[in-house]
Amino acid sequence: MMFSFFKSPIVSLTPCKTISIPDVYRYISGPYAQNRTRNLRSLADPQKAAEYKRSKFDYVTFSGVFQKRTDADLVAHSRLLCIDFDHLDNLQEVRRILLADTYFETLLLFVSPSGNGLKWVIGIDLQQASHEQWFQAVSNYLKFTYQLDADPACRNVSRACFLPHDPECYIAPRLLPELKQVLQTNPEVEELMNNLAATNIIVEQLNNESI
């Protein structure tokens, strides 16, 4: 489940390295995008906010490794699909719903750079269906089951996902061993692991309340 990481701005189409979900968790939970996320959310003008995000935020292509960020330059699919939910009035409720869903395992879940949306990363089996078919199937499932609308732009395999700061970012428990390896060489290990433990406790409490 490896994919490409790109440095800002968005017009930079050549990736600088290949990373994994635990790497993204470390980035989002750590201080790397904290200031720019705060600055973005302070901008009242939507056009200025969009320009700031496109010029200042690093990003990934969750669905694969690329030579360049175009569908034609896909080197290897990651077997991951990232679904965007924009302009949510009930963000915390949607977060709880996604984490409690038993059909799709949530591998990573975090608040979007704007602060009013969510990014949901799940695994897909390309032997069963293509990337676009999976996107359509998942979108239909979300709409029918939860009345949630997925951003249609996510059907593109080269879809860029900006990386914000979210100290409550969720990562699947089965990825914790790999995450610990990623964190071992970094000074912020203790703080990140404490944040992770607190987040998992909150998720467990929310799931218990929904039963």
Where are these regions (language model features)?
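Signature for HUH/AEP ssDNA processing cores
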Residues: 1-116, 124-137, 201
